[in-house]
Amino acid sequence: HFQLANVFCLPYNFDGQGGATNLGIPYIAERVTTILPDYPRGTLKETYEKIEKDLLEAIPLLEKYNIYQNDIRRFHFTAEAAYAFAARFYLYYNQPDKAKEYADKLLGSTPASQLRDWKGNYTGIDAANANAKALAYYRPTNAANLLVISLYSNYQFTTSSGESFTNSRYTHSNKCAAEETLWKNIWNVGRNRDEYNFAPYIYDKVFIDKVYQPKQPILDGERTIEVQLTTDEALINRAEAKIRLGDLAGGLADLNVWTQAYLRPGLAKRTFTQAEIKAYYDALPYADKTTRSPKKHLTKAHFKLHDGSTITEGTATEALLQYVLQCRRILTLHEGLRWQDIKRFGIDIYRWKKVDAGADTYEVPADGVLLGSDLRHAIALPQQAITGQIQQNPR
């Protein structure tokens, strides 16, 4: 239900009414016994209330019966997975105090020991063997993986082979990596993959232009494994919660713990001060139709800070939230969570298209802008659902 709500609904508090005026999703709480039943969508506020009710009832049971063999543990929704999910859920629900509470239950006061061993996990693996790295990434005995699922998909072929061509809808291009993500951040000002323990793969040909992280292994046929919840994401979520609550020092401390693990020692600066982060983002332009930048306007975020204010540009709070978004964007590349950050923070997005491959020229077409206030942030329901009498999203 949470996944469906975040695909087919607007972000919580989209219009400042706490989801009370926006469509939710049909919440299936009992067996359906008729063909084409009436599926009222209710409001997004009601959807979130029902998810919270189920979550709070489930957590004590998960804590009580939290007994699994280590090799199968991550294939189950354990208490630890529930804590990580709750941290994400309450951020989206605009309750950062509860997000921090559950992240604390998971991570405690010494989170470094619970993060992925970004250096050790890939030692001895052939750097040219992307699938071997993907297999190591999802390994179910890795304590940093809190929930892994098996699924049918061809996405792993799309990302790991030459099937992601220039300007295809799945491509994370070199231009995007250079000006918004992997090569454009406070720890790395050049096009260099060596700063990362989990080094990305780079294709920079005219017809195959992409940068990708090997996360979904190719198993047999169209089956793969996806990591749904990790301690690393939970730590960055806790950092966001702390910053939104006004604890800038605490949020920065969590981010420094993560960068120390994620970046290679000796090749990249791995910890930063609040002053350094603010200076870095102060010097960047905001992204618009003519400028690519990791720095986005956040003033339309669909939540208030701890003091009831909106995000003010040029403040330390804004700079640290920009940094949180950048860290999470890089950590969760290819996982779909960036779209949720775009929705929650009301970020305007621009679709850059290559117009001259030889000159490496890009532009944003007239229809290439999606404003943070656009109703299309709620994806249209498929025709099959409409035939089943479920109300379509407004446009």
Residue ranges and their predicted role:
Residues F303-R395:
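C-terminal functional modules
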Residues L4, A79, A86, T231, ...:
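Structural register within alpha-helical repeat arrays
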Residues H1-K64, Y68:
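Aromatic-anchored glycine-rich loop motif in surface-exposed flexible loops
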Residues D38, N94, K100-D232, R264-T310, ...:
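Hydrophobic-face positions in mid-chain alpha helices that act as interaction patches
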